[in-house]
């Protein structure tokens, strides 16, 4: 894999202008009042980044079409060029478990509603840990099992994740897909996915491989050598989500 350099990235110069242009792109003329909507501006979430990672360069994994990251010092990455027909904000593209930057490159990593889509979170988080500086922070915003369409599914345990590392991937994915279809799609809890063929959901980033509450993710991160800085059951400006902030030790 060819390594990239942070110094080669074209960072945004003006964060407020970047934010305005993105809201304009997504909402059109409604921008003039949408700018101040709490669920769009996400002031509380932005403050957590300022409080826990107020300096240094960061990497956002799977940024999609919205971000809360400080654009003047964050590299926006994604695995996909577009999401549901909308162009990603990302300027660099790669798989979340294969990051083309050197060891200890970043002061923080931000991930919002990404890790639940990843089949092998242990491998992925270890890769994120590799590119984090010592004492670097990881910010995980994730869907809460009890407040999303995953509420009828069993939670993903650490042992489940260990099994995925060594088990037969094709068979395990088939079992997860069956659970997803039976407890989410067939119950009409995610109708925006109805047009996607079942087998496609495995490869296109649709399916939630993981179902968690904060305690599950805290255990996972501690098991991988992180210290927990902060966690919250319900994010004030994204109420379907919980937050865990951890530090590389």
What are these regions (language model features)?
Residues 1-52:
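Membrane-proximal basic amphipathic "stem/tether" segments
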Residues 52-53, 103, 125:
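A short, aliphatic-rich alpha-helical micro-motif
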Residues 52-98:
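Class I SAM-dependent methyltransferase SAM/SAH-binding core
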Residues 56, 105, 135-136:
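Surface-exposed loop/turn positions
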Residues 94-109:
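A short acidic, Gly/Pro-enriched loop at the edge of an enzyme's catalytic core
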Residues 107-119:
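A short SAM/SAH-binding and catalytic strip from SAM-dependent methyltransferases
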Residues 118-119, 132-134:
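Helix-to-beta-strand junctions that scaffold the AdoMet/dcAdoMet cofactor pocket
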Residues 122-123, 127, 137-249:
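S-adenosyl-L-methionine-dependent methyltransferase catalytic module, highlighting the catalytic core
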């Amino acid at each position: 894999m060819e390594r990239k350099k942070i110094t080669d990235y074209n960072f945004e110069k003006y964060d407020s202008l970047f934010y305005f242009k993105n809201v304009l792109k997504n909402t059109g003329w409604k921008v003039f009042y949408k700018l101040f909507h709490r669920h769009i501006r996400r002031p509380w979430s932005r403050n957590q980044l300022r409080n826990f990672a107020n300096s240094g360069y960061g990497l956002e994994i799977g940024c999609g079409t919205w971000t809360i990251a400080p654009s003047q010092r964050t590299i926006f990455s994604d695995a996909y060029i577009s999401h549901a027909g909308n162009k990603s904000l990302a300027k660099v593209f790669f798989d979340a478990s294969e990051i083309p930057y050197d060891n200890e490159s970043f002061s923080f990593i931000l991930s919002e509603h990404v890790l639940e889509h990843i089949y092998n979170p242990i491998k992925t988080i270890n890769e994120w840990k590799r590119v984090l500086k010592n004492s670097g922070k990881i910010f995980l915003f994730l869907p809460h099992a009890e407040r999303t369409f995953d509420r009828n599914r069993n939670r993903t345990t650490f042992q489940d994740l260990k099994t995925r590392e060594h088990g037969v991937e094709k068979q395990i994915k088939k079992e997860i897909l069956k659970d997803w279809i039976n407890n989410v799609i067939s119950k009409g809890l995610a109708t925006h996915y109805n047009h996607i063929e079942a087998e496609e959901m495995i490869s296109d980033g649709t399916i939630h491989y993981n179902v968690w509450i904060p305690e599950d993710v805290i255990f996972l991160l501690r098991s991988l050598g992180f210290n927990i800085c902060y966690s919250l059951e319900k994010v004030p400006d994204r109420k379907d989500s919980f937050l865990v902030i951890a530090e590389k030790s």
